[in-house]
Amino acid sequence: MTRQAAGVTLADIQRPVADRLDTVAEELARMIAADLPLMQDVNRHLLRMKGKLFRPTLLLLTHEASGTGDPRAVRLAAIVEAIHLATLIHDDSVDHSVLRRGMPTVNTLFSHQVSVIMGDYLYSRAIIELARLDDLEPVRVMSRVTNAMTVGEMRQLAAFDALDFDERQYELLCRSKTASLFAAACEVGALRAEPAQRLAAQRYGDALGMAFQITDDLLDYTEAEAVTGKPSGHDLKEHKVTLPLIAVLSRLPAPERREVEALFHSAAPDGEQVARVVRLVEQNGGLEYARDRAAAFALEAEAALDDLPSSSARDALRDAIVYAVERRR
């Protein structure tokens, strides 16, 4: 890759589109505004939780890199962020998560019923804004991705024996739940570009999303909690099997395999159980394997950029690859 990870920040990546990202936040607030006081309260909370706007950033950068001058780019970026927020709200409700971005989740602060309805509301607002564009192409792309994410979530819920989850199923899940929205954001950013550039943007987003998700799953094994100094192991506590564990399961000796099974059979695994499984995964090469897979997808993303013309926006997209695989959270 062209730059060292230590030299790439999100601010660097967003610099070519920073002014329009502020407008995206304003457009999102306008888009989800509601008259009902309860919905207004939830919206205020959601806007305070505003994340990194990474997906809108990718959309605006691919729009810049493709050089199409599409005046709808900011609105499309806000639509993508609304859909992303909807998925987070629904995911937190399904997982009974307490915190998101260091703040209480909607289901914690309000209720599970409110979180389900608000997720639906954000989806419906996105659909309304798409319809107002009077163009079927972004509707086709975004309806396809929302369907993929929904099926992916159901596929995860339907995995009755988590320890039978293999790498093919894992990649299918990552592609549907994460990479699909990355790919859609990048494709929509290049909607008015030449077909080859639109395809390149979509391929870039897909590969970047895969690298991003694998890195996210790695962080669950490597990120230290401030108090204990041990890996957080949040996914393991929730009995979620991700690539680092998948990579070693088939070759673990029977006694160590039984330790993993004991954790997954425990309704509430304790910190020592989690720490022990994390050590087993690391000692047997699971973290290294996952890093290698993330790096492979990063190379795919970088190769896709070769079909976009040289520009500062394309450079920022290249930096986004480094950021995705080297970030701490």
Language-model segment annotations:
Residues 1-329:
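All-alpha prenyltransferase/terpene-synthase fold signal
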